[in-house]
Structure formats: C-alpha cells, structure tokens
UniProtKB/Swiss-Prot annotation:
It is found in: Late endosome membrane; Lysosome membrane; Cytoplasmic vesicle, Phagosome membrane; Cell membrane. A motif (CX5R motif) lies at residues 140-146. It comes from Macaca fascicularis. It catalyses: a 1,2-diacyl-sn-glycero-3-phospho-(1D-myo-inositol-4,5-bisphosphate) + H2O = a 1,2-diacyl-sn-glycero-3-phospho-(1D-myo-inositol-5-phosphate) + phosphate. Interacts (via transmembrane domain) with ATP6V0D1. Interacts with LAMTOR1, RRAGA and RRAGC. The chain crosses the membrane at residues 219-239, 249-269. Its EC number is 3.1.3.78. Catalyzes the hydrolysis of phosphatidylinositol-4,5-bisphosphate (PtdIns-4,5-P2) to phosphatidylinositol-4-phosphate (PtdIns-4-P). Does not hydrolyze phosphatidylinositol 3,4,5-trisphosphate, phosphatidylinositol 3,4-bisphosphate, inositol 3,5-bisphosphate, inositol 3,4-bisphosphate, phosphatidylinositol 5-monophosphate, phosphatidylinositol 4-monophosphate and phosphatidylinositol 3-monophosphate. Regulates lysosomal positioning by recruiting JIP4 to lysosomal membranes, thus inducing retrograde transport of lysosomes along microtubules. It is an enzyme of class 3 (hydrolase). Residues 17-38 have a biased composition (Gly residues). The active site is at residue 140. Keywords: Cell membrane, Cytoplasmic vesicle, Endosome, Hydrolase, Lipid metabolism, Lysosome, Membrane, Phosphoprotein, Transmembrane, Transmembrane helix. This is Type 1 phosphatidylinositol 4,5-bisphosphate 4-phosphatase. One of its GO terms (molecular function) is phosphatidylinositol-4,5-bisphosphate 4-phosphatase activity.
Amino acid sequence: MAADGERSPLLSEPIDGGAGGNGLVGPGGSGAGPGGGLTPSAPPYGAGKHAPPQAFPPFPEGHPAVLPGEDPPPYSPLTSPDSGSAPMITCRVCQSLINVEGKMHQHVVKCGVCNEATPIKNAPPGKKYVRCPCNCLLICKVTSQRIACPRPYCKRIINLGPVHPGPLSPEPQPMGVRVICGHCKNTFLWTEFTDRTLARCPHCRKVSSIGRRYPRKRCICCFLLGLLLAVTATGLAFGTWKHARRYGGIYAAWAFVILLAVLCLGRALYWACMKVSHPVQNFS
C-alpha cells in the first residue's frame, strides 16, 4: 500500500462535485464515487485528441521544387493574372503602359503612374486637344486662339495662333512618274506630262530624256535638216563658183548655209548622245 501511495500524484484532479465525492484520488489514479467505487479521474493520455486520418498515406519524400543554391524560375508576365490580351496604350507623358480595357467608350484615360490624361479617341467635332507645358491635357474649340490652364499652380495662358475657320482642303498629292536618272542613277519625280520629255535631275542637275522616243525623233529631224543644208551648201558652191569671184557676198551665203548645216548635224549628234532616264513606277 505504501508503494501504491508513493506512485499517486501529489495533486488530485477534480471530479464532478455533484456526485458527493471527496475530491481525492486514491491509489491507481481513481476517485471514490458515491457508491464507494472508484471512477477515473482523467482520460488517458492522448484520448482527447483526434486521431489522424488513416485514409491518406504520407507524402513520399522526393526532391524539393527548388534545390539549395538554385535560382527560382524566372517570372513571366504572360502568366500573371493581370496580363493577357487586354488593350494597352502608351502614356503621352511618362511613356508607361495604360490598360484601356472597359474604357474604350471614353475619350481620355488617366495614367496610374503620372496621373495625367492621355487621349484614346479623336476630339469631338469642333474640338481639339492641347497639352499645357505642365502636362495638363486641355480640350477647347478649334477656333480658339488663347486658352488658360485651369490648374491653380499653373494658370498659364497658351497662345494657339490665328486659326481660320472652315474645312481645310487637303493638299493635293503630287502626280507624276518616278524615274531613274541616266547620269547619277538616283530616283526623282517627274511631273511634266508634255511632248518635251526632258527632265533635270535634282541631284546632279543634269538634263536627260524620259524614254528614247523624244531624243530619237529630234535626232532624226536635225540630221535630215543638216544633211539637206549640207547638200544645199554644196550645190550653192558649185553653182555660184564663177560669180563668187565677182560678187564677194556669195561667200557670205556659203558660210551661212554651211554654218547652219554644221549646227544641225551637231544638234543631231547631241540628241543621239543624250542620256535616257527610265521610269520606275507611278507615284499615284
């Protein structure tokens, strides 16, 4: 009995007081009940805890996702939930990207970085956008000449200059043919649609012909005229040989006809040696 008393705890566990027990724990770890019997004072160790589920086997020990000393996988913006095929525009002030998803019905959007407005649509009819040097986006009438910035720390007056009301006629597009210069091989625009197909290159300042038809025709005409004048000068010389000794003016007539023949033949040679520029494509 002494040995049993030494193994009992020093402090007894309380039991239900409604049963009339003395609240002491006897040997064996039990308390006396109303009938003199012994009742357990406390549940055994671990009885109040839930048993772990037995349906799931323990996880096998494998290699970790990231080994020690190894860098984690790089972040990809395509896997971010915020990224995707959302429409984006560039801020006109800080060049940051602005998501305009769900805002396409608006005319301007606000940048989340610099808090400035950026237009995503054209201004309403009769209006135009003007950006103040303080980066404030203003909208005013097309005919406005002076506007004031509404920001209290700016209040700047912006002069837009004289504006002539009325629809602006678009500038006519140049019509012509792009050709490759026969001298410097550079491309330039030829806009003179006439029978005289001579063009001066703006790069080398030399004259060439657009196509071979015009210089060939001029060469043939000058050659035939020069040949006719040469025959005329020869016949005139043989026919007036005797009279030339008496009248000195006949020599002047010979010289004039021969000079015309030489000029025509020289001009024919000029047209025959002229460089030709070839057209590339229609500009219009």
